[in-house]
């Protein structure tokens, strides 16, 4: 899948990602889906999406025929609600009123995990992460191991304004769409 956010115009990084995505898909007999990651309602603009689609078409990158041409996160609220309901049923979700300033870094310390806050105005929702390792195979680097609970702590899945977070939306989308390979750049 190629999944840009329409928060600005297509740039060289997008083009490189598109070339690699289409190339890897073709080399492995896969298909390319276009997913517009427009979860950030404050920064996403229709004219950026239109320009992005025009630029991709001009470059010759179009979603594969027969697939849903464009998937938009803004059209998938019910999918996210269903995923949230599953997490709630497993008692993995809790309300959190911590601001970015209070957290102060990349790792959330779990302050609200046991506070018993009520969901509503002024709170976001976090998912309780399991302790331990997560493993995966990186096509370039080989087998990898990470500890998300130690690296970032419990992840925010819906913010105080009721918007789905990037981390939650892309994870649910990839699971829902049965994506097996994700291409990201490394810095």
Q: Each PLM stretch: what is its role?
A:
Residues 1-105, 175:
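N-terminal Rossmann-like or analogous alpha/beta NTP/dinucleotide-binding catalytic cores
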């Amino acid at each position: 899948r190629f999944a840009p956010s329409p928060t600005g115009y297509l740039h060289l990084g997008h083009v490189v990602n598109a070339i690699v995505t289409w190339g890897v898909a073709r080399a492995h007999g896969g298909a390319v889906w276009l997913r517009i990651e427009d979860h950030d309602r404050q920064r996403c603009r229709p004219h950026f999406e239109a320009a992005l689609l025009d630029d991709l078409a001009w470059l010759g990158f179009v979603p594969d025929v027969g697939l849903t041409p464009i998937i938009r996160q803004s059209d998938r609220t019910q999918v996210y609600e269903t995923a949230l309901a599953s997490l709630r049923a497993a008692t993995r979700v809790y309300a959190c009123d911590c601001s970015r300033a209070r957290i102060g870094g990349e790792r959330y310390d779990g302050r609200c995990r046991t506070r018993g806050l009520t969901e509503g105005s002024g709170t976001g929702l976090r998912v309780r992460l399991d302790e331990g390792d997560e493993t995966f195979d990186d096509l370039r680097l080989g087998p990898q191991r990470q500890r998300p609970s130690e690296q970032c702590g419990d992840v925010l899945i819906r913010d105080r304004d009721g918007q789905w977070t990037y981390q939650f939306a892309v994870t649910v989308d990839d699971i829902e769409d049965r994506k097996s390979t994700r291409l990201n750049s490394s810095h």
